[in-house]
Curated annotation (Swiss-Prot):
PANTHER family: BETA-LACTAMASE YBXI-RELATED, PEPTIDOGLYCAN D,D-TRANSPEPTIDASE. Pfam families: Transpeptidase. InterPro entries: Bact_Transpept/Beta-Lactamase (IPR050515), Beta-lactam/transpept-like (IPR012338), Beta-lactam_class-D_AS (IPR002137), PCN-bd_Tpept (IPR001460). The active site is at S76. It catalyses: a beta-lactam + H2O = a substituted beta-amino acid. It is an enzyme of class 3 (hydrolase). Residues 1-23 form the signal peptide. It comes from the Bacteria. This is Probable beta-lactamase YbxI. The modification N6-carboxylysine is found at K79. The gene is ybxI.
Length: 267
């Protein structure tokens, strides 16, 4: 009898302890004042900028504001815009629309196969989105980038190259403005189009959050990396932009570390 009482007590204490951890984490996020965040430790080995905007409280944190205002090439974060435009003008039907691999061996093995709009987003297969940009065409692309006020709106670098270390540039703060409108579904696209692209951006889902994002890397030297997106939690939504002198993977790792630190990503 005493043994069973002991087991019940241990299980009860463990349950209470687990609840306390979640409750503390949840409370941490609920009372988060993003304007008072500190991310110095996360950037001690990397030059970069980080932006977090609390959509409910309309509070914004910016680390390294000077860099946050500097325009740089969007790299593969432009896939988000490319997909939105492609779906809107019906250059592609949906996230399952297949393009056949042309047999050319490219940088990453995961690119060397047939892809859909969705799989090419997840694997960041550049060739698929280059083909999509050609299908959209210069005139429609110019019109839409102007409508969106997307960075400097310059596609002179070529219809399938302009976002890749070329003519199109955008600042991290401009990226945040664009992503905020996407998160709220306030961009000038049809609602189903925005929902499809947001679904393709899902990086991971937990019991209490969903993380949406897209990386971007300057492949010529791995010296420019982005991770942009938003996270939905039990208490609200937050838009983030990370830009570093490193790879997109590094930018994502820094972002996830910060989101965990402040209780937005919970186990």
């Amino acid at each position: 009898m005493k043994k069973w009482i002991y087991v019940v007590l241990v299980l009860s204490i463990a349950g209470i302890g687990g609840f306390s951890v979640h409750a503390a984490s949840s409370a941490h996020e609920k009372h988060l004042n993003v304007s008072k965040m500190n991310v110095d430790d996360e950037f001690k080995d990397t030059d970069g900028t980080f932006i977090l905007h609390d959509l409910q409280k309309d509070q914004t944190f910016v680390y390294n504001r000077k860099r946050a205002n500097q325009r740089q090439t969007p790299q593969s974060t432009f896939k988000v815009v490319n997909a939105l435009i492609g779906l809107q003008v019906k250059a592609v039907r949906d996230e399952y629309d297949v393009k056949r691999w042309d047999g050319v061996k490219r940088e990453f093995e995961s690119w060397n196969r047939d892809h859909t709009l969705g799989s090419a987003m997840r694997e960041s297969a550049i060739w698929y989105y280059q083909a999509l940009a050609r299908d959209i065409g210069e005139e429609r692309m110019k019109t839409w980038l102007h409508t969106l006020s997307y960075g400097n709106e310059d596609i002179s670098g070529g219809i399938d190259q302009f976002w890749l270390q070329s003519s199109l540039t955008i600042s991290p703060l401009e990226q945040e403005t664009f992503l905020e409108k996407l998160a709220k579904e306030e961009l000038p696209f049809d609602k189903p189009v925005m929902k499809i692209v947001k679904r393709m951006m899902i990086q991971e889902e937990g019991d209490h959050y969903t993380l949406y994002g897209k990386t971007g890397t300057r492949l010529t030297d791995m010296g420019l990396g982005w991770f942009v997106g938003f996270i939905k939690t039990e208490h609200g939504s937050y838009v983030f932009v990370t830009n570093v002198d490193d790879s997109g993977t590094k930018a994502k790792n820094i972002t996830v570390d910060i989101l965990k630190k402040y209780g937005l990503i919970t186990s």
